[in-house]
Amino acid sequence: NGLAMQKFRPQGHEIGLPVLKIKELRQGSCDDSSELCSLSIKPEYIIHNGDVVFSWSGSLLVDIWCGGTCGLNQHLFKVTSDVYDKWFYYLWTAHHLARFIAIAADKATTMGHIKREELAKAEVLIPCEEDYTSFNSIMQPIFELIISNRIESRKLAALRDELLPKLMT
């Protein structure tokens, strides 16, 4: 789970790191209106391109972050595994998302959220090692390409936004 980044503001002349909140996760990138946090936060709270991020409170969603390096705010999980590849846990999280949303909506009094116990109840089918290796040989390159294309698309959009005003004058 992320940090309450308002407690970790940049100090002095520190440039700061954009904060990844639900708004940024929805739009796929941080922008000039994104809050900043200190660069000295622990590494586990820093999100990089290709990290899987799950919003568990308010707006429930999961995405592969490709919006640049930023600090992970509270109400967001950085989803990782020491055993399984990114495509595997991303797709299983996405598979369960509709059910998580329904659970949060049923329990919502103000802002819906999902509890860890509900996440723990989510079942995942794990293939045998041979099948997993076969799936991985197909899925891993696809996910690497998706991430690469999304990063390139963001860079090209930024370049367009920078050059277009110059071309119009």
Task: Tell where the protein language model's regions lie, with residue ranges.
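Amphipathic alpha-helical segments that form coiled-coils or helix-hairpins used
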Residues: 1-19, 27-28, 125-128, 154-169
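Short capping/connector residues at structural and topological boundaries
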Residues: 8-13, 25, 30, 35, ...
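Amphipathic alpha-helical coiled-coil/heptad-repeat segments
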Residues: 84, 88-91, 95-99, 105-108, ...
